[in-house]
């Protein structure tokens, strides 16, 4: 497997709708206001995806237990805003602005941006498997003892694309993966 460069990512986004909407280049300043942004868009060997305005922040209002086999949404507070405050030592779910369609011979890895990591904000996203498509559900942990701010419509993580020299026998779409074509923030399901 080899990592794919900006030219390949651009061609796949524009000709195969692999990333929608696609931003051709790094954006780090709001052109209208001059405000600095956490960068997003096409980079040399990846694509920096953005957070949407949808967030789900963990709360313990009902004294619940997090159980991935029996997950209830009453452990979340849903927020729609340009920023989200993640409580100290807590966790939030969000989704990407971008919708991805991964080719059959490609696997991605997603790595959190250093700007957030240096603030104690850790991002986890599982690989996008061959022929998976959907909005990306993003797990965000605030490892600090302080509230942490995350920004909608700005970069949160970088997606790296790896192309195999051979095609897999069974893709995510073939096995009817449970998170196929997910819209919005998708909570755990078994």
Swiss-Prot record:
Q: What class of enzyme is it?
A: hydrolase
Which residues take part in binding dCTP? 113-118, 158, 172, 181-182
Q: Which reaction does it catalyse?
A: dCTP + H2O + H(+) = dUTP + NH4(+)
Report the pathway entry: Pyrimidine metabolism; dUMP biosynthesis; dUMP from dCTP (dUTP route): step 1/2
Q: Which UniProt keywords apply?
A: Hydrolase, Nucleotide metabolism, Nucleotide-binding
- Give the EC number: 3.5.4.13
- What name does the UniProt record give this protein? dCTP deaminase
Native species: Chlamydia pneumoniae
